Amino acid sequence: MDSYWRLKNLVNDLPVSTSLSRQGSIYSWTVDQFQTSLGLDCGSMNMDELVKHISSAEETQEGSQRQGSTTLPPTLSKQNVGEVWKSITEEKHTNNNGGVTNITHLQGQQTLGEITLEEFFIRAGARGGNTNGGSIHDSSSSISGNPHTSLGVQIQPKAMVSDFMNNMVPRSHDSYLHQNVNGSMSTYQPQQSIMSMPNGYSYGKQIRFSNGSLGSGNQSLQDTKRSLVPSVATIPSEAITCSPVTPFPTLNGKQKINGESSLLSPSPYISNGSTSTRGGKINSEITAEKQFVDKKLRRKIKNRESAARSRARKQAQTMEVEVELENLKKDYEELLKQHVELRKRQMEPGMISLHERPERKLRRTKSDIK
């Protein structure tokens, strides 16, 4: 219990930062305000439908600031808003002591209607781009329940601080603590994005962990498993000691906690704005191949239909010839019958008239009479 109050005091001591890029935007409205203005029930619609309604409201709302599109992961787009909020508020995490801590205890018992649209999308894991070139990750995300308090806490889905208060961490007001979900601590300057290290620059001093590993200021980016954040703030002279980093198990690129897969892919909040043409080439190749297959299939179907019509025409002609042949056979049989009957009638007695031959008369051709 003492560790919880110390964590709460540490959160309250961090500086407050308002999200200037979201002022005047519909994303700064609460869910109740959005439902009242549009007359909709957000809890019963899908995440895709909610994003579409927000986009249409931004187009029709006068004086509202356009914040760009919001991208949802495939596993999240078809889920219900109420189910997503329930999964967010009922997340559980088992700490090293074997206890179970409910995350709703740290979120101040917020309801879906009290939370802003921006904070809801952040907790759900949506990725979006605004007009300033940043991502939706730049907005405020609060654990204590205040939506305008920027804690600099990088929240992963279904994750919480593990064994945070096992070792007391000395606080310094000259630097800010960047807290990872695995329990590691590093110095962090607010509103600095995670970027690749340019040539000629190096990262600040890192923190000594309890397992003996130490990150120096000249450490390269080859070890991508460790989160390196540039910082210009001062660090206390003593090394900060924290519990060893215990990464959560992953399956197919998604973190799993307590045997359940998370809603999002790893690191959905970081958007560096880089684009790649490889995906476009692959899509164009797939499209060309699909068009070729469709054309071949249409040609095959056309040939089959033509062959079927030819067979049907030949079959009709054959049937007509067969019918005509049958008629001729019947006529021939009838003629034969008539001929036989006529012969029978001629052979019956009395039916044939016998004409007597006339008597032969001798005609004198020569005469002796003189």
Swiss-Prot record:
**Region (Basic motif), start-end ranges:** 295-314
Q: Name its GO BP terms in alphabetical order.
A: abscisic acid-activated signaling pathway; positive regulation of DNA-templated transcription
Q: What are the recorded GO MF terms, alphabetically?
A: DNA binding; DNA-binding transcription factor activity
UniProt keyword list: Abscisic acid signaling pathway, Activator, DNA-binding, Nucleus, Phosphoprotein, Transcription, Transcription regulation
- Renumbered to this chain, region (Disordered) spans 56-77, 260-281, 349-370
Residue numbers of Phosphothreonine PTMs = T111
Keyword S-adenosyl-L-methionine set for record: no
Q: Where located?
A: Nucleus
Cellular component per GO? nucleus
Q: Which stretches of sequence are listed as region Leucine-zipper?
A: 328-342
Return the Basic and acidic residues bias intervals: 354-370
**Residues bearing Phosphoserine?**
S25, S44, S69
Coiled-coil positions are none
Keyword field contains Transcription regulation: yes
Where are the compositionally biased (Polar residues) regions? 62-77, 260-278
Q: Where is the bZIP domain?
A: 293-356
The record's family statement is: Belongs to the bZIP family. ABI5 subfamily.
Task: Summarize subunit and interaction data from the UniProt record for this chain.
Answer: DNA-binding heterodimer.
Q: What does this protein do?
A: Could participate in abscisic acid-regulated gene expression.
What protein name is recorded for this chain? ABSCISIC ACID-INSENSITIVE 5-like protein 8
Gene name?
A: BZIP15
